[in-house]
C-alpha cells in the first residue's frame, strides 16, 4: 500500500463504514504517474467466516494501475446488534454498532 498517494493514512471516519467505493477526498494523487483521477476497484472478495462477512478489495490508480490501498470491511451480528468495521489506508478506519431491535436498549432510560 502506498502512503505517498494519500493525504492522511488511515483517517478516523467515525461511524462511516464503506462496503464499496473510495474516499477520494483523501486521495492526494498517484505517486507513480502523478495523476489524480478516479480509482479502480479490483480483487473484490466476499468471505463468510463464523457468521461474519468480510469484504476485501484493492484501490488502484485508474491510469497506471498502481495499488494505492487494500480495503477491508466486516459485518457481523452480535447478540442484538449489527457491528460494522472498516480499515483502509485510503478510506480510513471506522466502526459502528446498530441495534436490530425496534427500540435500541442502549438509549432506554432507567425507570425508578
Curated annotation (Swiss-Prot):
Zn(2+) 2 binds at residues 30, 33, 61, 64. Keywords: Activator, Developmental protein, Metal-binding, Transcription, Transcription regulation, Zinc. One of its GO terms (biological process) is mesoderm development. GO terms for cellular component: nucleus. It holds the Pfam family Churchill. It comes from the Eukaryota. Zn(2+) 3 binds at residues 59, 71, 88, 91. Zn(2+) 1 binds at residues 2, 5, 30, 66. One of its GO terms (molecular function) is DNA binding. Transmembrane segments: none annotated. InterPro entries: Churchill_sf, Transcrpt_activator_Churchill. Belongs to the Churchill family. Transcriptional activator that mediates FGF signaling during neural development. Plays a role in the regulation of cell movement. Does not bind DNA by itself. This is Protein Churchill. It comes from Mus musculus.
Amino acid at each position: 500500500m502506498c502512503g505517498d498517494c494519500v493525504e492522511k493514512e488511515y483517517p478516523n471516519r467515525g461511524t462511516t463504514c464503506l462496503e464499496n467505493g473510495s474516499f477520494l477526498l483523501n486521495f492526494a494523487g498517484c505517486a507513480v504517474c502523478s495523476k489524480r483521477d478516479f480509482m479502480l476497484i479490483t480483487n473484490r472478495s466476499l468471505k463468510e467466516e463464523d457468521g461474519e462477512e468480510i469484504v476485501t478489495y484493492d484501490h488502484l490508480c485508474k491510469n497506471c494501475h498502481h495499488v494505492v490501498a487494500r480495503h477491508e470491511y466486516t459485518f457481523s451480528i452480535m447478540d442484538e446488534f449489527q457491528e460494522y468495521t472498516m480499515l483502509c489506508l485510503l478510506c480510513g478506519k471506522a466502526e459502528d454498532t446498530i441495534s436490530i431491535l425496534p427500540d435500541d436498549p442502549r438509549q432506554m432510560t432507567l425507570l425508578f
